[in-house]
Design a protein with these regions (language model features):
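N-terminal amphipathic alpha-helix/helix-capping segment at the start of soluble metabolic enzymes
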Residues: 2-41, 135
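Hydrophobic or amphipathic alpha-helical targeting/insertion segments
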Residues: 101-142
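Structural preference for beta-strand elements that scaffold enzyme active sites
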Residues: 21-23, 36-40, 67-69, 89-95, ...
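Glycine-rich phosphate-binding active-site loops on the catalytic face of alpha/beta enzymes
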Residues: 64-66, 109-124, 216, 239-253
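Active-site mouth loops of central-metabolism enzymes
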Residues: 34-52, 71-73, 90-98, 119, ...
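Alpha-helix-loop-beta-strand connector modules within alpha/beta enzyme cores
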Residues: 74-96, 129-141, 201-212
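Catalytic alpha/beta core domains of metabolic enzymes, predominantly
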Residues: 146, 154-284
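Glycine-rich, proline-tolerant flexible connector loops at the mouths of alpha/beta enzymes
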Residues: 42-50, 61-88, 115-123, 185-194
Length: 284
């Protein structure tokens, strides 16, 4: 499947081109290909707090969240995941920070996928060790590039966090994965700047057909954070770019899930759960 291919989506009488991507699965949820665009969020509890985390996950699922991400930054978090995953109503992804061994521990705990930041785990042997284990378990990995934590070498090469630097970071990580025969990949190239984020995703969509996870980093609290995140995510979705989305708000994660679901419904990309209430200012 060549990058840049599109399929047609009939949305409320309009024909919209959606970029065709490879399809992968996170647990029982398909991402990419012709699968519906999914909503993700992230828990704010300590992952070691099993009951508190599960309570939040159930609330997220009720709000329309399809996939949830939990931090795995210490042994206690990995132990918590081992109890959370079998009781979660939706697939669980482990968010890995700086220690590749935490990724291996999360895999052992039974998570449905991983998120790795190339700017935080940079040694090729560590990256390949995680990819090899994920390959053997059939688990997908998101390459989570962030403009604020790029590899210093790329930052110096491009004179800053440019779209080109972010795309190259993703491509470098993907090359390490391919060296060990791992291809269950999705990618994000997030930034707190909407124009930077949008351009990075556009450039990435031109060079790969892996599923893309959309988001604006540190969008902030509502309402400004909602506006900022929507500006970036909706722009790309209307261009046919994006297979899964997350609002990153300084707020209860349930608000993230609701916002993501409502955006997809507003764009005609997911079926509405609720009736639209339309207020006409000129009506009596």
């Amino acid at each position: 499947m060549a990058s840049g291919s599109v399929c047609r989506m009939d949305v409320a009488g309009w024909s919209t081109a959606r970029r065709v991507t490879k399809q992968i699965s996170v647990g029982n949820v398909a991402i990419g290909g012709s699968a519906p665009i999914t909503v993700q969020s992230m828990t704010t509890t300590k992952t070691a707090d099993v009951e508190g985390t599960l309570q939040q996950i159930y609330a997220l699922a009720a709000a329309g969240c399809d996939i949830v991400r939990c931090t795995c930054n210490e042994a206690e978090a990995a132990e918590g995941l081992a109890q959370i995953v079998p009781r979660s109503p939706i697939p669980v992804i482990a968010d890995i920070h700086h220690q590749y061994k935490m990724a291996l521990a999360a895999i052992e705990a039974g998570v449905h996928g991983l998120r790795l930041n190339p700017g935080n785990i940079r040694r090729p042997e560590h990256i390949k060790a995680v990819a090899t284990e994920a390959r053997d378990r059939g688990l997908p990995i998101r390459i989570g590039v962030n403009a604020g934590s790029l590899d210093p070498a790329l930052y110096d090469k491009y004179g800053g966090a440019t779209p080109e630097a972010m795309v190259e970071s993703a491509q470098q990580e993907m090359a390490y994965f391919h060296e060990v025969g791992f291809d269950l990949i999705k990618i994000s190239v997030k930034a707190s700047s909407v124009p930077l984020m949008v351009e990075a995703y556009r450039q990435l969509a031109d060079v790969t057909d892996v599923p893309l996870h959309l988001g604006v980093t540190e969008a902030g609290p509502p309402p400004a954070g909602l506006v900022k995140a929507t500006a970036g995510i909706a722009t790309l979705l209307l261009e046919g770019i994006g297979d899964t989305i997350r609002y990153s708000l300084t707020a209860d994660p349930v608000e993230e899930a609701r916002a993501g679901r409502q955006l997809l419904e507003a764009l005609g990309l997911r079926e509405r759960k609720n009736v639209d209430l339309i207020a006409c200012p000129s009506c009596g």
